[in-house]
Amino acid sequence: MIASTESPRTNFSLSRGLLDVGIAVLAFVLVCAALNALLPFPEIDVVSAELRFFKEHRDEFDTVFIGSSRIHHQISPAIFDRVMGEAGHPTRTFNFGINGMFPPESGYVLERLLSTKPRLKWVFIELDELETRRIPKAEASRRSLYWHDWKRTSLVLRKILDGDDQRDARDLFFFHTALFAKNFANIGRKIDLSWWISHLGKKTAAPKSLGRDGDGYVPQIKTMSEAEAVAYEAGLKRAVVQAELRRVSPSTERAYRQWADDVRKAGATPIFLITPTRAQTKFEFRPESGVAGAVMPFNDAKGYPQLYRNEIRVDADHLNETGAEEFTRLIADTLSRLINDGRIQ
């Protein structure tokens, strides 16, 4: 029999080395987790300021719209409240739309908003697929980083892995994983602590992003040029022909189910809103999905032709001020009708 040449001391050293590495990794993870819990919310352009404003004024609102620029520039709280009041269902509305805020970032912000314990009645959430694409202009920004906690990142990674394009999937998988790692490791958080200390006890001014009435709505005045209108009409005709009813992806469904549950736990009713974009695909949830929320789809050029007139649009996806006012009235009328019919409460 040939005796082993590997000494017990070597085996012990290797095991001890692995143990030391494991302890170091565990310590790093625990420290990062502790810092995540203790550090103030990151100072993110527009987002942080509006969250602070909402927290300070949360008792003044019972209705919130949350989503992207298609909410920010297209929902007038003043008009919504007026129409709802005239219908016998008074509301006090805040527009929490932020340019470029798509799910799952919007879901993360919704959770932060609900954590302020507002007394809400209605929460409108823009309905769209989870955004997984890389946005070159924003890749290096803290805006891309701050919402990448494990809850959001796992949803994005699952959506990527469920996709068809494996080449893009590999790149996107590592991209979002890297953002999660940076966020978890608190990269760049020193600036947040410094900001928090320097503003401790100071009252901050209302952010300009809240618009002229301080309710979050910023209308757009622009109209399409003749050339833009021609291109828009041609694209809309194609979109109407290709219109379809499509179920959201499993990851998107999971995300919206959680958000709907969170809203209901907060004592409010969730409503999912599809804005009048040129894309005519109607999203829906599986009947057995368990998503507890009504869907209001307004991306229907045949059903709502008044929202697709050239003169009330900025581009294929956005309405100007005139269009936004008309859209807001339609939403309020629809909600009032659902309440009166007992189909929502």
Q: What is the predicted function of each stretch?
A:
Residues 2, 140-258:
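Secreted/periplasmic serine-hydrolase-like ester/acetyl group-modifying domain
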Residues 282-345:
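C-terminal regions of proteins
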Residues 190, 257-283:
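Active-site segments of SGNH/GDSL-like serine hydrolases
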Residues 16-37:
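Hydrophobic membrane-insertion alpha-helices, especially the h-region
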Residues 64-67, 319:
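Short hydrophobic beta-strand that contains or immediately precedes a catalytic carboxylate
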Residues 38-59:
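Alpha-helical transmembrane signal-anchor/signal-peptide segments
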Residues 66, 70-160:
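Membrane-embedded segments
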Residues 1-16:
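N-terminal Lys/Arg-rich, disordered targeting/topogenic segments
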